[in-house]
Amino acid sequence: MALVALLSNPRATGNQAMLPRVRDFCAAHDDIFHYEVEHADQIGAALRTIARVKPRVLVVNGGDGTVQAALTELYHGGHFRGAPPPVAVLPNGKTNLIAHDLGADGDPIRALERVLALARTDLAPHIVGRELIALSGGSPAGRPVLGMFLGGAGLAETILYCRHKIYPLGLPNWLSHGVTLVLGLLAILIGRRARFLPLPPRPLKVSVTRSGVLQGTFAFLMVTTLQRLLFSGNMPGAEKATGSMQLLLIERSLPALVRALVASIRGRLGRIRLAGVHLERGDEILIEGCRSSVLLDGELFEADTDRPIVLRPTPPVPFLRLAA
């Protein structure tokens, strides 16, 4: 039996430099069971092996895509008898949205030390329930894919632009994201396709249970169960009881984006009505569009007019919150 099981993806951005330190730390602590995978299809076998050591905490060491693949297998695989252990996430990818939401910031080794210290105590005060987004459609996969953050419309095109055009330049993450933000805003300001800018978003139809239908061209589409996201503040409605997903849609106009940005910085997003900014909560969200890209924790899916993407929340899954 191990206190902590660590599932690492050596190909994650941070692990390219950090993994030797992680290996050394695990070698110095017998109560950590370390398993490395290089491909998503290896995660099922990894979790079957990890289940045999009965860890108190499962730690995922990789980017948001690695976390998404692990959560999907953990939820559907049934590898653990009874309830699975709480999940902790190390900040070792490019965006680290999930790790950030769970209070894991800064040095991954410090975060791992914190996990190990908590695993030696009563975990109950540090366990939080998080609903996941179950995505079906937009892929031939037979079972829903699980994640915590979905981006679509102009946001998805901008993320893909950053991934394929900016990251290969080798810039620091903060600078890559800043350059991408500026170019994304420039694309909206110009209002037409340009070779050096992110692709313009395609028209979408978004249906939310109990809230109606939103249709048009949007600069920003986000569905999330995360609570901390924009400027380290809480998502609108995050203080409410669990039971629904949060949707943020911003129309493709610079004034609407500026209004949303200013409201986010001031902590007023969701508290006041803003023209061109739509905030909804729902138990089922349908996204339809002609070959419109969406990204769930970094994995690409495509909505179509005859094959909508359907999002539903899962029951709460236990996570380990590292913040004091």
Predicted regions and their residues:
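Short glycine-rich anion-binding loops that position phosphate/pyrophosphate groups of nucleotides
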Residues: G63-T66, T72, N92-T95, A153, ...
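ATP/NTP phosphate-donor binding region
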Residues: M1-N61, G65-G77, I109-E113, A119
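Cofactor-binding loop segments of dinucleotide-utilizing enzymes, especially the Rossmann-like FAD-
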Residues: S8-N9, N92, R252
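Short N-terminal binding/cap micro-motifs at the start of the first secondary-structure element
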Residues: T13-A17, E157, L229-F231
